Amino acid sequence: GIYFIVAKPTNEGETGIARYNDIQIRNCSLDTVNRWGIAVGYTYQWRQFTTGALSDATMAKYASSNVVIENNYLNHVGGDAITTMYLDRPLVQYNVSENAAEQINTKDYSQQQPSLDANGNENGKQWVNAGRVAAAIWPWKCKNAIFQYNECFRTLHASDGNGDGQPWDADYGDGTNYQYNYSHGNTASTIMFCGPESINNTFRYNISQYEDMGPLDPAGNSGNCQVYNNTFYIKEGLNTIWHRSHGNGGPVDMENNIFYFAGNTPVAVNDWNPSGNKTYSNNLYYNVSTYPNDANPVKVNAGTQVLVNAGSGPDSVADDKSARRHEDPTATTVFDGYKLAENSPAINAGKVVVDRNGYTIDHDFFGHKITAVPEIGAAESDAVAALVLRSNVYTVTGTNVSDLPKNTTVEDFLNNVIVDTGVTVTIKEGETELKGTDIVKGGATITLSYEGMESVTYTVVASSDKELKGCFYEVKGTEVRVP
């Protein structure tokens, strides 16, 4: 495969700490390779990365940076397909993996592995299963790694010696984000959150289909872990959303997900909350007879049309071996069976999610902008059920809008508010309609209208530009007294 390591310089005092900057691995095809397909960044400075939280100072000094891995195809990889190691904010996108972990099994790993000293000399033996783990596309000791628009099929041998077998694995690292990915037919769970130094994870707007185990594998992760707006199509015969044997002890917060259990017989789901540290809010549960403690569940019987054609996602790679694009909301894609059906109970049934890891929530799996009232699952829709205005910039309380900076124009305002597609927004000062570069001042009204619905009006509360106005004031110690 392709393997980049950072070796110790002969004279580090003279040359400085070694690290890569600006590695781009693009448009490569790797077929039938040994332990790794693509791996970038293993460093002699690994001892600087021994905590869960990775500071920006540590990353700037010791981590490699500006790494992009995209548009690669990997097949029949002996172990892991793509791994980023000790990298600051790597971007891994539009890659396709199939048949990873081909050698991670009890036949190929049937003897004890050698243990090596710092000079590479054998100094003993490890257990037979040492190193017998491989997932497809994942980070190790990276900060704010983004994995998006990747596809993964049939990561192998989770039931035959491979301790992993997932398509995605938020392993030891800080701020890992998996978004807009598609996986099918992998032998373990969809996503593993692995170990106590796996923190601040985001898993959102992904589609999973027919994995051999339940979709989630919180294998001892700690701290913040958000799973929201995913669609999990769980194959018939499974009665859990968890990995079969990893214990599932890590915390996970689940919001706006579709848990779609295939088949016609309601599934008695086993243990929605192992270790008692899982939370649920606004998820949709299809074809189940037992439910978790969800703050606002949507319970759906088998036969209800939730998705256009559930289970119809691709089961193999594209003919040209490339990742299939799906970020244009006007385009037809092979994933369209996972768009929401007309009158789906998932439409306008979601909650407004705040990503605690600081990732902006812009669009869904298909590139559709997130609307004022979000949907449940990986797909948004154009359906309008209520006239609602919200913003990630201004404060909306009831029908009042506040915290507009001074001299906010109509154009600025419209760029910073969110309404459903097709809703008309009219801004007025008194009876005069404001447009373009007109300034939106306190007292202005914002009216939302949509055909067949009663309009809703919001009012702008006087701008809080947070500037200290001209006045006499008294300074005493650390206090400023304003009359």
Identify what each model region corresponds to:
Residues 1-2, 12-13, 34-40, 78-86, ...:
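Short glycine/acidic-rich loop motifs that flank beta-strands on beta-rich extracellular proteins
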Residues 15, 19-20, 25, 33-35, ...:
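Parallel beta-helix/beta-solenoid
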Residues 177-183, 195-337:
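Predominantly extracellular beta-rich ligand-binding scaffolds that present long acidic/polar faces
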Residues 298-383, 400-406, 482:
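C-terminal accessory segments
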Residues 385-422, 467-483:
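Solvent-exposed, low-complexity, repeat-rich "mucin-like" stalks and linkers
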Residues 420-453:
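Serine/threonine-rich, repeat-prone extracellular segments and beta-strand-based repeat modules
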Residues 454-462:
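Edge beta-strands of extracellular beta-sandwich domains
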